UniProtKB/Swiss-Prot annotation:
Miscellaneous: In the reaction, the free carboxyl group of octanoic acid is attached via an amide linkage to the epsilon-amino group of a specific lysine residue of lipoyl domains of lipoate-dependent enzymes.
Function description: Catalyzes the transfer of endogenously produced octanoic acid from octanoyl-acyl-carrier-protein onto the lipoyl domains of lipoate-dependent enzymes. Lipoyl-ACP can also act as a substrate although octanoyl-ACP is likely to be the physiological substrate.
HAMAP family: LipB
Reactions it catalyzes: octanoyl-[ACP] + L-lysyl-[protein] = N(6)-octanoyl-L-lysyl-[protein] + holo-[ACP] + H(+)
E.C. designation(s): 2.3.1.181
Protein name: Octanoyltransferase
Positions of the BPL/LPL catalytic domain: 33-209
Amino acid sequence: MALLPLLDVINLGRQPYEQSWQAMTAFTNQRTPDTPDQLWLVEHPPVFTQGQAGKAEHLLFPGDIPVVQTDRGGQVTYHGPGQLVAYPLLDLRRLKMGVRDLVTAIEQTIVATLAEYGIESYPKPDAPGVYVENHKIASLGLRVRRGCSFHGLALNVDMDLSPFLRINPCGYQGLAMTQMRDLMPETPSLVQVQEQLVCQFARKLGYETCTMRAN
């Protein structure tokens, strides 16, 4: 695989979900064949997001947490502080990748990232995401427009998991969630996990260099 020139990594800090969604949609609509690929890192305030395949009955009792209907694939999930969210904004035609290839690459990136912290995890062929002993630790939801990807992944690092009890995560009743904090004697910081995930992602897709900057 020929090395690609650049992956532009942008850390958005903590940002409302809808603001990130509007920005990634605008970026995807405006990019040209020469636009460098980007990977956005972000942490969202509490929010439930409902994918295009989402069904209302999977929102059990959202309560005071807002619900946003999105254009990504998949069903309902939760985002909140202490969760690593990453949005790969990639030109899949330039990468010569299909959507399934990207899903596999993201899952492998998460598995490799967790392995660096001694956590053994695996993807499921019939249920996108990454799991540890049948507990879900990372969720995926993508959209492709004009051959370019947006939306992405969410990895549970050190967060309050209780809002997941208000939904059927990803449309699965009773699906148990887990996080890195519950699987390690000492939890790394979100920034440390972000840096590890960026390295694994760049290696997996063959980017030669990464630039990292705060927005």
